[in-house]
Amino acid sequence: MDLASLNAFIAVAETGSFSEAGERLHLTQPAVSKRIAALEQQLQVRLFDRLGREVRLTEAGRALLPRAYRILSVLEDTRRALNNLNGDVSGRLTLATSHHIGLHRLPPCCAPSPAPIRRWRWTSASSIRKWPTRRSCTAAPSWR
């Protein structure tokens, strides 16, 4: 079981589409299909029911999904912990704000951050409802 296949599995499960998963992963749809087929063969189970263009998780797929999230999370935590031993502070910072605050108020405040934040993700507070449950918001600032 390799990480590329797990990422493809999660992307298909979240989007419900091999094509959309490919777009998310910057892969072609056949490349995503190949990764899923390899994972299914390795695990000897079908992970998705394919009904025309519709894709649904099988019982095995539903059992694998939370475990796949945990595997990737543990790997990321391990990488972060090892980097932190070197004094590098890293990780993802996700801020959910209103449109105006995210565009106009936060950038000047966040520019002089104490640690170099390599990956910013700006999203509107209203879009949080659409996130899969595994994602979380690091901070949701309020301005008065």
Swiss-Prot record:
Pfam families: HTH_1 (PF00126). InterPro entries: Tscrpt_reg_HTH_LysR, WH-like_DNA-bd_sf, WH_DNA-bd_sf. Residues 18-38 bind DNA. GO terms for molecular function: DNA-binding transcription factor activity; transcription cis-regulatory region binding. The keyword S-adenosyl-L-methionine does not apply. Gene3D superfamilies: Winged helix-like DNA-binding domain superfamily/Winged helix DNA-binding domain (1.10.10.10). Residues 1-58 form the HTH lysR-type domain. Keywords: DNA-binding, Transcription, Transcription regulation. PANTHER family: HTH-TYPE TRANSCRIPTIONAL REGULATOR, HTH-TYPE TRANSCRIPTIONAL REGULATOR ILVY. Belongs to the LysR transcriptional regulatory family. This is Uncharacterized HTH-type transcriptional regulator in ibpB-leuC intergenic region. It comes from Azotobacter vinelandii. The lineage of its organism: Bacteria, Pseudomonadati, Pseudomonadota, Gammaproteobacteria, Pseudomonadales.
